[in-house]
């Protein structure tokens, strides 16, 4: 009786090993050696959502990076809305003849803040003396 019990136990163990190895073999799948990068999958729920560039800050979380500009940035004059060609603030000639002036209408022309009065900028041009110096301000 013992021999039939041992043979049936051996048959069960051998059968378990055979079925276990068959299950392992059937569970394997073919993995390509070089994956195709053109076959990118995106979810199609309501709209096509493409992954956006993000940055991970440890301890804070993940943030979206701003999108790259598709068009180049052209600065414009906020007063007239016209594009600036020089890239800076346009000079004002005061409605007089040729030659650029550094004084803007309504702007503060002083080099040092002086709440009592405005003094012209000490440059060669309008408001300067004969040798390029600013004339003294007369006191009352």
Swiss-Prot record:
Swiss-Prot/TrEMBL induction comment: By gibberellins.
Composition bias, Gly residues: 85-98
Domain of life: Eukaryota
Tissue: Inflorescence.
Coiled coil: none
Signal sequence bounds: 1-21
GO cellular component: extracellular region
InterPro entries reported for this sequence: Put_cell_wall
Keyword Secreted: yes
Keywords in alphabetical order: Cell wall, Secreted, Signal
Annotated segments matching region Disordered: 85-140
Compartments where located: Secreted, Cell wall
Location, primary (coarse class): secreted
Official protein name in the record: Putative cell wall protein
């Amino acid at each position: 009786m013992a021999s039939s019990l041992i043979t049936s136990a051996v048959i069960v163990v051998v059968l378990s090993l055979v079925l276990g190895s068959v299950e392992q073999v059937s569970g394997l799948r073919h993995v390509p050696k070089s994956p195709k990068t053109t076959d990118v999958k995106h979810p199609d729920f309501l709209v096509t959502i493409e992954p956006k560039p993000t940055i991970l800050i440890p301890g804070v979380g993940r943030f979206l990076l701003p999108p790259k500009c598709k068009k180049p940035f052209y600065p414009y004059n906020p007063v007239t809305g016209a594009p600036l060609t020089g890239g800076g603030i346009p000079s004002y000639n005061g409605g007089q003849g040729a030659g650029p002036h550094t004084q803007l209408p309504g702007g503060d022309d002083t080099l040092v803040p002086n709440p009592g009065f405005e003094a012209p900028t000490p440059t060669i041009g309008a408001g300067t003396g004969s040798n390029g110096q600013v004339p003294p301000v007369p006191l009352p």
